């Protein structure tokens, strides 16, 4: 049985299903926004991007039908981000960008945009999307450097940096990032597309909380995690005896 996390469960199964599907729809919408708004064919045509939602601790609660190697690091990214940027530094309207492999895996061109979501001044979730930028600087165009002997040859390493706040874009910080990349105009369009996806996701979550109340939505988060745990335990029990790697 899943561990008792001390959280109330939603009383009505229909409410859980509505919330569940609202979360899934929000993650799907994020990916559509990036594809329709970005300038790079790598995003608009190839769809090399992914989107997800986590709770305030970085536990995955919903994801788009995107790329598994991206989706597998979303929760880890938020948890590692919070080790570097404490919650008391986060504000409504912030969107942080990062690409460090040690803060979410993947390679440098996979740039993540992360937005904390607040309801009534309380941090309740994160919206996060990942987009493969067609160039992240480095020794060669496209930023694939097979002969690299160190990570610095592969491109710009973006530690968590806030590029947007409630006041709008931080042009100085954005210009610093773009000055280190090839194809500045295209990269800028991709960057703003990622911001737009997080912005819409935050509004969708706030609407969901306003409609059902924080206690109910957060209880649904807990129920989703409990269901995932039960399903994983059932899958493990179904494995035949033996050694597994």
Task: Annotate each language-model stretch with its function.
Residues 45-48, 109-111:
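Short, small/polar residue-rich loop motifs at catalytic or cofactor-binding pockets
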Residues 1-8:
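Short, Lys/Arg-enriched N-terminal segments with co-localized hydrophobic residues
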Residues 110-120, 128:
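A short, hydrophobic, proline-anchored segment that marks a local hinge/packing element in signaling
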Residues 22-46, 82, 86, 97-104:
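Short, basic/aromatic recognition patches
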Residues 10-15, 157-232:
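N-terminal leader/propeptide and maturation segments of large enzyme subunits in energy/redox metabolism
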Residues 123-180:
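Gly/Pro-rich active-site capping loops and adjacent beta-alpha segments
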Residues 41, 48-98, 209-245:
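Gly/Pro-rich turn-and-neighbor structural signature
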């Amino acid at each position: 049985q899943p561990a008792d996390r001390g959280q109330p469960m939603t009383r009505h199964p229909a409410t859980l299903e509505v919330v569940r599907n609202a979360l899934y729809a929000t993650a799907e919408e994020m990916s559509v926004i990036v594809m329709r708004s970005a300038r790079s064919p790598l995003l608009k045509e190839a769809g090399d991007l992914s989107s997800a939602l986590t709770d305030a601790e970085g536990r995955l609660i919903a994801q788009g039908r995107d790329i598994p190697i991206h989706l597998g690091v979303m929760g880890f990214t938020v948890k590692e981000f919070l080790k570097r940027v404490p919650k008391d530094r986060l504000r409504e309207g912030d969107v942080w960008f990062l690409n460090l492999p040690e803060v979410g895996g993947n390679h440098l061109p996979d740039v993540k945009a992360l937005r904390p979501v607040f309801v009534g001044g309380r941090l309740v979730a994160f919206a996060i999307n990942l987009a493969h930028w067609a160039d992240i600087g480095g020794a060669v165009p496209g930023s694939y450097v097979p002969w690299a002997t160190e990570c610095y040859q592969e491109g710009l390493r973006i530690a968590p940096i806030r590029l947007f706040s409630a006041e709008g874009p931080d042009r100085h910080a954005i210009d610093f990032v773009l000055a280190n990349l090839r194809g500045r105009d295209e990269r800028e369009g991709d960057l703003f597309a990622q911001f737009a996806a997080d912005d819409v996701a935050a509004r969708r979550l706030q609407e969901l909380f306003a409609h059902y109340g924080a206690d109910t939505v957060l209880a649904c988060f807990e129920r989703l995690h409990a269901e995932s745990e039960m399903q994983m335990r059932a899958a493990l029990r179904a494995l035949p005896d033996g050694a597994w790697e």
